[in-house]
Design a protein with these regions (language model features):
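Hydrophobic alpha-helical segments of integral membrane proteins
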Residues: 31, 35, 45-61, 71, ...
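Hydrophobic alpha-helical transmembrane segments of membrane transport/permease proteins
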Residues: 2-50, 143-165
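Transmembrane helix irregularities
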Residues: 14-15, 123-126, 243
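Membrane-water interface segments at transmembrane-helix boundaries in multipass membrane proteins
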Residues: 118, 122-126, 130-185
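Alpha-helical transmembrane segments of integral membrane proteins
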Residues: 79-112, 160-312
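Alpha-helical membrane-inserting segments
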Residues: 3, 7, 11, 15, ...
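Juxtamembrane/transmembrane-helix interface segments of polytopic membrane transporters
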Residues: 8-12, 132, 136, 140, ...
Length: 312
């Protein structure tokens, strides 16, 4: 995480001068220099970075150059929108991808399986912003049944703002969540399909058939259980990926989350927000990988057996 923070912090010093966006053309060079000194921009990079790390360890990421507000407050405000979008997208990708993957893995030569695999190529081939624009044009412009931007009406619960408790909020999250989930969904479809096809050819499945176990029990109890083990790993990592790549989706749909805040920060060269965002993403990936490793140990008996053998 420190490496990610340092590299990103160093690169941000070459994206432009934030002072140009903070003051007008009539501002004198002396006033610009004084503002740089006040913000600490005249200090060497390693000094700025050390100050950033010390403050970040206390939950302080500085003041936004653009909004003149503490970055930590901005993150707290925008985080609920991103979390809700990512959670819904992850559920759509995991549930739909698993069901379609199982179906195409069991019915390998079916006509519907070919259609599903062909359509899934669109999720991989088309960029996210193109899919988002197409959805907006179809469902918001032509049909007019879903909103094209924004989060809708939200309810303030004190520590959290949610759109799940309002009709407009639920309608507003449909298009961006489906758009964000498509790429991960197609990946899960192909992963589950490949796992099911491989497992159905293994010796213990053939032995189960020889014992007279029903075909449905073999497919949906024995094969599916083992086929979902790698999916859990991918699904966990995909949550971090969805948060990182929600930038494009949030920008297309003007979704007021952290990704949209990051894009605005890049346009304004708001270094405190950009640095805090990337540190947050790195932290999310570290924590998700840690949790997935723990879940993997409890789900996959082979890992427990290896651990018992090595400890014994």
């Amino acid at each position: 995480m420190l490496v990610v923070a340092f590299v990103s912090f160093s690169l941000f010093n070459f994206v432009g001068d934030p002072i140009n966006n903070m003051v007008g053309e009539e501002t004198s060079d002396e006033e610009r220099a004084e503002l740089r000194e006040t913000l600490g921009l005249m200090d060497p990079i390693h000094v700025q970075f050390s100050r950033f790390v010390v403050n970040a360890s206390k939950g302080e990421f500085g003041i936004s150059y653009q909004l003149r507000r503490p970055v930590s407050d901005l993150i707290v405000e925008r985080l609920p929108a991103t979390i809700e979008l990512v959670v819904i997208s992850a559920l759509i990708a995991l549930i739909t991808g698993t069901l379609l993957g199982v179906y195409t893995g069991i019915n390998r030569k079916g006509f519907l399986s070919d259609i599903i695999l062909a359509v899934s190529l669109l999720g991989v081939s088309l960029p996210t912003f193109v899919i988002g624009i197409l959805f907006i044009y179809l469902f918001a412009v032509i049909l007019g049944i879903l909103p094209s931007f924004g989060r809708g009406e939200v309810v303030d619960l004190g520590f959290w703002t949610t759109g799940f408790l309002t009709v407009t909020g639920l309608k507003a999250i449909i298009l961006p969540s489906v758009t964000l989930s498509l790429f991960q969904m197609t990946y899960i479809i192909r992963l589950v399909r490949a796992e099911m096809m491989e497992i159905l050819q293994t010796d213990y499945i053939k032995f189960a058939r020889a014992r007279g176990i029903s075909e449905n029990s073999i497919k949906y109890k024995h094969a599916l259980k083992n086929g979902l083990i790698p999916v859990i790993t991918i699904a966990g990592i995909n949550i971090g990926t969805l948060i990182a790549f929600s930038i494009i989706t949030e920008t297309v749909f003007q979704w007021p989350g952290m990704g949209f805040l990051f894009i605005q920060a890049v346009q304004f060269v708001d270094i405190p927000i950009m640095s805090a965002y990337l540190v947050f993403i790195a932290f999310v990936f570290v924590m998700i990988n840690f949790i997935v490793d723990i879940l993997y140990y409890f789900i996959d008996p082979r890992i427990r057996i290896k651990g018992d053998i090595s400890s014994g």
